[in-house]
Amino acid sequence: MTMKLPIYLDYSATTPVDPRVAEKMIPYLCEHFGNPASRSHSFGWVADAAVEEAREQVAALVNADPKEIVWTSGATESNNLAIKGAANFYASTKGKHIITVKTEHKAILDTVREMERQGFEATYLDVKEDGLLDLEVFKAAIRPDTVLASVMFVNNEVGVIQPIAELGEICREKGIIFHVDAAQATGKVDIDLSKLKVDLMSFCAHKTYGPKGIGALYVRRKPRIRLEAQMHGGGHERGFRSGTLPTHQIVGMGECFRLAKEEMAEENKRVGALRDKLLKGLQDIEATFVNGDLTQRVAHNLNISFAYVEGESMIMAIKDLAVSSGSACTSASLEPSYVLRALGRDDELAHSSIRFSIGRFTTEEEIDYAIKLLHQKVGKLRELSPLWEMYKDGIDLSTVQWAAH
């Protein structure tokens, strides 16, 4: 089989729809087109049965009750519904203080900022240099009026896995609603909501080989969590989220979560071996740094800073590799990654970082090609860099006084 270029190594931005998922979706576009809310004929019943089967499949991956799964348009909407919905519902009884983390996805940070505009107070926690949250720092941030805490399961840029079980225990003990953004976690880490003390959890399909435009929010029933709806209309999804359900998208999400449950253990082994091969192949390039803890991390992610190479010029030089610097949602801006800044990386190293994310359809041949290409291009770009020359001459660049410009 000949290798196709460019090589896709950006699975954390999105994944291709697995052909098995696409095949399952197609009948619900044409023949089974009924509205799942149509209760009076078989077109509606067939669609409704498919929606409920998918709800069971999503619940099964995370060991939840299907009744706790609410369909949304994606993880961004789930995050908005969870944070705005819970904070507003409980503000009068619990308080108006929210805790989150500086390395969260923009869908969390911007939602919390919006809550601040509405009169809530927020604490944005620092992480350690390895990207992980210190539990003591989290505990210290809790106030009597803390209503909600939101911490992501797996970071989208550096792939580190936060200590969700421990954080859940702390929140439950203090009576704080605990929300977790698990967009990057499904199919990568085991999630057991019968054990985790998590009240709200956001999911989407397109990071797990399903279609874009569909997600879900887990809303715990015992103890019961209440939310204020953010989307008003026909009262679908038990009033949490109005709007006609997109049966084909939902079927796709159900199927991709079903496959994830079946194949996750094997896939993580294979993907982890490819990631380790990539890391080993790049470690002998001088002045490279891995961003984020390597043990508490999903198998799919490798984020490396190549010192003295500008991230943007690097991406141009390796255009045969589809990779990103920073996350897809913010990589259009030339600002250095706020996640890497929060890990204590300086602007230069944050700017020279590349995120490689590997997935279901990545081959060993592609990884070999990537290693070879990176060795060539990093060398070439550094030859053009006056900073590299100074570094090689033993000059400590942090002591250089640059003229203002």
From Swiss-Prot:
One of its GO terms (biological process) is [2Fe-2S] cluster assembly. Pathway: Cofactor biosynthesis; iron-sulfur cluster biosynthesis. One of its GO terms (cellular component) is L-cysteine desulfurase complex. Keywords: 2Fe-2S, Cytoplasm, Iron, Iron-sulfur, Metal-binding, Pyridoxal phosphate, Transferase. Its cofactor is pyridoxal 5'-phosphate. [2Fe-2S] cluster binds at C329. Pfam families: Aminotran_5 (PF00266). It comes from the Bacteria. The keyword Nucleotide-binding does not apply. PROSITE patterns: AA_TRANSFER_CLASS_5 (PS00595). InterPro entries: Aminotrans_V_dom (IPR000192), Aminotrans_V_PyrdxlP_BS (IPR020578), Cys_deSase_IscS (IPR010240), Cysteine_dSase (IPR016454), PyrdxlP-dep_Trfase (IPR015424), PyrdxlP-dep_Trfase_major (IPR015421), PyrdxlP-dep_Trfase_small (IPR015422). The active site is at C329. NCBIfam families: IscS, PRK14012.1. Homodimer. Forms a heterotetramer with IscU, interacts with other sulfur acceptors. Belongs to the class-V pyridoxal-phosphate-dependent aminotransferase family. NifS/IscS subfamily. Master enzyme that delivers sulfur to a number of partners involved in Fe-S cluster assembly, tRNA modification or cofactor biosynthesis. Catalyzes the removal of elemental sulfur atoms from cysteine to produce alanine. Functions as a sulfur delivery protein for Fe-S cluster synthesis onto IscU, an Fe-S scaffold assembly protein, as well as other S acceptor proteins. This is Cysteine desulfurase IscS. It comes from Dechloromonas aromatica (strain RCB). The lineage of its organism: Bacteria, Pseudomonadati, Pseudomonadota, Betaproteobacteria, Rhodocyclales.
